[in-house]
């Protein structure tokens, strides 16, 4: 069965995941993580992608981006992926593939669903039982989004900025979101949407996407998430 084509629309947030080949380790030292982040910053600027959230796990990568152009996300992942493989092969005297293949992705509805995806990404190390709290994990954007740590890589999305209200601090309100776990149903919906290259959002969002791309899409969520989870 042919793989479902990616759904990519300029300006619409996209959750991306890139896995190591056979789920093998992709990052071996702190220097590897730092080099990947340097590439991410460089290629995001070059290919016009806003990075809103990220998490580098030992054997896969999560990104939440808003591409400015139809091919921005693909060029971003190609630019980062190829150069990182070259770096790893050179550094560790190895050869061959590092990544599983094509990255997987899903479009994310900004209104009411985007912050769920932020949390999903930055809670990965906690779900993997690597740490007890996302602030303890160095290789994610949590400290940027929740603790106002400086970053050249992260561009805040309008939905994130709106958490601050009139003159408030988005980071303060953002931290409050992590006092409650993301519902397991939503975790499954995000995973299903991403692995299937579908959409994570409501019915109206799915219809709007279908009109833009001229084909049917499947949603990763059967309805609107509850107010309490965002």
Features from the language model and the residues they span:
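Short Pro-Cys-Gly-centered "Cys-loop" motif that presents a nucleophilic cysteine in a tight turn
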Residues: 1-53, 57, 66-230
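Glycine/serine-rich anion-binding loops at beta->alpha junctions
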Residues: 60
């Amino acid at each position: 069965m042919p793989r479902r084509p990616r759904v990519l629309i300029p300006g619409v947030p996209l959750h991306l995941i890139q896995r190591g080949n056979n789920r093998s380790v992709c990052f071996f030292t702190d220097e590897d993580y730092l080099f990947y982040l340097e590439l991410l910053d460089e290629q995001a600027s070059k290919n016009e992608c806003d990075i809103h959230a990220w998490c580098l796990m030992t054997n896969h990568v999560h990104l939440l981006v808003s591409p400015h152009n139809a091919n921005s996300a693909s060029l971003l992942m190609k630019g980062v992926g190829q150069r990182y493989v070259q770096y790893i092969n050179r550094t560790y005297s190895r050869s061959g593939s590092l990544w599983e293949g094509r990255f997987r992705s899903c479009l994310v509805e900004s209104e009411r669903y985007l912050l769920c995806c932020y949390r999903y990404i930055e809670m990965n190390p906690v779900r993997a039982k690597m740490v007890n709290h996302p602030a303890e994990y160095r290789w994610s954007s949590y400290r940027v989004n929740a603790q106002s740590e400086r970053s050249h890589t992260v561009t805040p999305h309008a939905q994130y900025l709106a958490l601050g209200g009139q003159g408030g601090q988005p980071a303060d309100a953002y931290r409050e979101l992590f006092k409650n776990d993301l519902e397991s149903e939503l975790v499954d919906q995000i995973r299903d949407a991403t692995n299937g290259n579908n959409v994570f959002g409501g019915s109206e969002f799915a219809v709007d996407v279908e009109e833009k791309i001229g084909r049917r899409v499947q949603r990763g969520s059967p309805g609107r998430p509850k107010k309490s989870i965002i």
